């Protein structure tokens, strides 16, 4: 990617009030990673993430907030650059606790000239690498949903597979199947190595919230923080929403 072109996007670290960021960061306990007696422990901290860590306190690994701010701003910068170039961004979350958070974020950023979609709770293997086949399957489901969803709801029919598919793909629109996404924003990378591997095989960059035990291999733009903190995930999404709205007006 052209670094000179990226630098044209007007999003800088100066957009942040650093003191307020660090206050919000610690309030959300985003700096408190997993418990570990040894910062380099294979069980609790991944070697590739050690450079983002300060040390241990009360058996908790502490993530360096200065590193988080630097990497977070860089990630927002990249997201803004892709949006400005009219690229497609896919948000992936398979944590049910964050499902409503992702849905609310999506509804708040529905803009005609911005292509952002999401997969919630369940990832379909081969979604990126077997794109055409998976898209056909999802489009078949969508056609079924358009025709029978009202009937299923009105008659309170127990249809677990339909419910699971609906939950997973309600963040996708027909126009999202025109081509593969150009950038992935991954909420919980520890549970989704297969998503990263698919993206890497197709040279699709990945932005991800990375904890102390996250393997950074294949993650282009890590955001160090406690991935179990819903407040921190919400904070990240709020800033991404700002970038999306800014991009839509340029």
Predicted regions located by residue number:
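Ribosome large-subunit tunnel/peptidyl-transferase-proximal elements
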Residues: 2-226, 230-250
């Amino acid at each position: 990617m052209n670094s000179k072109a990226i630098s044209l996007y007007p999003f800088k670290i100066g957009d942040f009030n650093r003191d307020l960021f660090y206050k919000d960061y610690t309030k959300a306990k985003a700096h408190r990673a997993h418990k570990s007696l040894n910062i380099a422990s294979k069980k609790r901290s991944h070697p590739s993430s050690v450079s983002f860590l300060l040390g241990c306190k009360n058996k908790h690994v502490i993530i360096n907030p200065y590193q988080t701010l630097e990497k977070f701003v860089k990630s927002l910068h990249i997201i803004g650059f892709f949006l400005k170039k009219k690229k497609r961004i896919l948000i992936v979350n398979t944590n049910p606790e964050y499902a409503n958070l992702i849905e609310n974020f999506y509804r708040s950023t529905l803009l005609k000239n911005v292509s952002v979609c999401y997969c919630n709770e369940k990832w379909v293997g081969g979604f990126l690498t077997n794109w055409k086949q998976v898209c056909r399957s999802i489009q078949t489901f969508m056609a079924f949903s358009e025709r029978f969803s009202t009937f299923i709801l009105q008659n309170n029919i127990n249809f677990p597979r339909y419910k699971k598919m609906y939950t997973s793909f309600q963040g996708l629109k027909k126009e999202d199947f025109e081509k593969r996404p150009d950038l992935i924003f991954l909420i919980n990378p520890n549970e989704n190595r297969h998503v990263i591997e698919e993206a890497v095989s197709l040279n699709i960059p990945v932005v991800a919230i990375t904890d102390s035990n996250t393997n950074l291999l294949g993650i282009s733009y890590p955001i160090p923080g406690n991935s179990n903190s819903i407040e921190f995930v919400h904070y990240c999404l709020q800033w991404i929403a700002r970038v999306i709205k800014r991009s839509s007006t340029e």
